[in-house]
Each structure stands twice: as structure tokens, then as C-alpha cells.
Amino acid sequence: LIILAGRPGMGKTALATNIAYNAASVFRQEKDEHGNVTAEHGAQVGFFSLEMSAEQLATRILAERSEISSEKLRRGELSDPDFSKVVRASQEIESMPLYIDDTPALTVAGLRARARRLKRQHGLSLIVVDYLQLMRPSSSARLNNRVQEVSEITQGLKALAKELNVPVIALSQLSRAVEQRDDKRPQLSDLRESGSIEQDSD
């Protein structure tokens, strides 16, 4: 379980999207004569976006890969060369093992069920969750204490990483405390509802 933390607007999603794209873009498997996988490069990625819709995320990836601003893409203001770039980039993205799930307010149990299905149907070697604080604990464990809820979520993600034997990158918000200090470098204690996050993450 890897935690990628930052204050809002600092580029957590952009970095996570980049990691996911780059891992998926180089994915390939080497097999022996019996068809057994002997080596794997890159990753089959499950991106669980609780903040942005799949469409927003895809537009962001497409804009970055085609080197055309997402504003231009949204408005459809594309020249012929721009359009060709977009078509090329979208074909490239479509062929990648990058699966986006934008179900809002997912519980750990819901995420686990989706990840298991993804692994069974397509294969899965990396999970990205954007972001931790938007997840909900399982309905049976709805608690009044948010710290305990986050603890249940991080423990669930850690267990999922072990069960499926895949790394889980979970994005997390930092508290405002980091902005009050002269030294703005984040510390583990700046993680929102921090105790369990620093305890459960690798």
C-alpha cells in the first residue's frame, strides 16, 4: 500500500494518472512454449476515481498524450493536424490495459469486488485509488469516528493488496497544518486522520 499525499490542487491526480498511463502503455507479457507467463513488464491498471468522472479523467489523459489543451478538446476547437493527433492518441489509449471506474463513495467491500472481477476478466497488476478520504467504510462498520473509519479503509486496502498480490497506490489529502508552518515540507503527521494511514502504508 503506497500513499501519495498532498494538499488540494498540488497535482496528486495528475501524477497518479501519469503513473497509471505509463505503466499501462508499456505492458507486455512474456510466455513460455506452454503459454505460461514467465515475465511481465508494465502493468494492467485499475484506476478507481472517486473525485473525477471517467470522462474528465479520459479527457485529461487524452489532452496530455495529444499535447492539446483539455479546454480545446472540450470546445472541439481542433485544426486538422490537432484532430489527427487526438485520433492517434485515443487509439493508443484504447488499446491499453487501463480501466477506469468512477463509482462515487465506494466502500472497501465495493472496491474489492470490482478489483477481483477486473483481475478475473482482464488481469490486474496495479490499483490506483483517487482518493482515500472519499471512500466509505463498509456499511456494517459505519462509525461516528472518522479516524476509525479511515483506519478500516486503509486496513481494507492493505488486505486487498495482499489478497490480489498487486500494489495499491492511494491518494490522500494533507491537513491544513502544513500551510501554517514556515517549513512547508509535509510530515507523516500532516496526513488527514493520520494514525492508521502511516501505520498501514508501506
Describe each PLM feature range.
Residues 12:
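Conserved lysine of the Walker
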Residues 60-67, 132-158, 181-186:
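Conserved P-loop NTPase nucleotide-binding/switch module
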Residues 15, 19, 57:
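Hydrophobic positions on the alpha1 helix immediately C-terminal to the Walker A/P-loop
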Residues 2-3, 46:
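Short hydrophobic/aromatic beta-strand immediately N-terminal to the Walker A/P-loop
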Residues 148-202:
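Phosphate-binding/switch region of NTP-binding enzymes
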